[in-house]
Amino acid sequence: MKALTLFLLIFISVSIVSAQPIVVIVRHAEKATNGGNDPDLSSAGQARANELARILKDSGITAIFTTEFKRTQETAAPTATSAHLTPTVVAAKDTAALVAKLHQLNGNALVVGHDDTIPNIVKALGINSSISIPGTDYSELLIVILGDKPELFRLHYPDDAGI
């Protein structure tokens, strides 16, 4: 976990020096099995959301974007509280609106999406390689460094129990 935090801090430092914004993209954390189409996070998901906030604590996040679904909002909530930010809700399928907002930022952002929306977001940010997020994977942490030639870095982060 210390290695992941160090890795993030290095990339955030590079971003600050080069004035290139960084977009951190994660899939929402584990969801409860009940709750229909809009479930809350499970206890494992809450633990993962708390760990995300801990990892991003000193990352210079100045904006947070979620979708209209509770699971993305609950994943972002601990980071928003820690950073004293109010997340912006963007419709899950409105990739163009989200990317437009990201390109207007003068800072780093956290985007909490879904396994089926993240590949489109990454592509719209200028990353040419295609990615997929397995429906059972909640640990992907993608870092996109914006600029003339955006760069993508793929990491994984555990919940606080280390899963």
Identify the role of each PLM range:
Residues 114:
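Conserved alpha/beta-hydrolase "nucleophile elbow" surrounding the catalytic nucleophile
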Residues 1-20:
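Bacterial Sec-dependent N-terminal signal peptides
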Residues 20-106, 117-132, 137-163:
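Active-site-proximal alpha-helix that buttresses catalytic centers in soluble enzyme cores
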